[in-house]
């Protein structure tokens, strides 16, 4: 097992240039020295969950607000550009018990300092069954939700959800209820984990994803692959030409999709 690869040691981080979103200011609702997540993905840049939740605890609404306000004021005063405020960080942002209230506060601050900037949430979809969380996701500009495989065994192998009741069937059904506003992100990879082959790029996998996408009717699908080191060492990046071929096949089925590498 590798050590943690990337942790964000503050509540607000960046801005950084995101290959998917542009100039992005990050919001980390998890501990500054550990990871809390409802998945334990083989490819997570923050490492496996077993490496620890840290000691700092979750930031309060007041801390998030104060830190974000200070950063936005500084950027605005310096005439800097900002495309998006992105909830990501050290784990699953929707696990924060005050996620809906924090969303509303971030919207308020965005409107005050960078009204043209978007607000994005990168989520693994595990908390969309909570109506308060789903309603909060409906209030942001880019509600970006994960679906790495539409085949149950593959999803469990890659994403390793903590909740045994989290299934592909349930999440696809709930994603449909966003009625075309959700953006779906899918990580493409292959390799092996503890002697078991891992590959969500096969024809069977792509057909299952197409069926799921057509059912969900997302605003867009973001198709991407590994960009940093991963806790599972035996994973292989899917290169741009192959990503484009997969995206073309999905697009031909009537799905709006964009490959990133």
Roles of regions detected by a PLM:
Residues 1-42, 47-59, 70, 74-80:
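N-terminal [4Fe-4S]-dependent radical SAM core
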Residues 2-20, 69, 190-261:
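Auxiliary Fe-S-binding modules of radical SAM enzymes
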Residues 24-26, 84, 144, 183:
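Short hydrophobic-acidic sequence motifs that mark active-site Asp/Glu residues
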Residues 29, 87-89, 186, 225:
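Short glycine-centered, acidic/aromatic-flanked micro-motifs in structured strand/loop junctions
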Residues 43-139:
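Conserved Radical SAM active-site core
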Residues 95-224, 229-236:
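Conserved AdoMet/S-adenosylmethionine-binding subsite of the radical SAM
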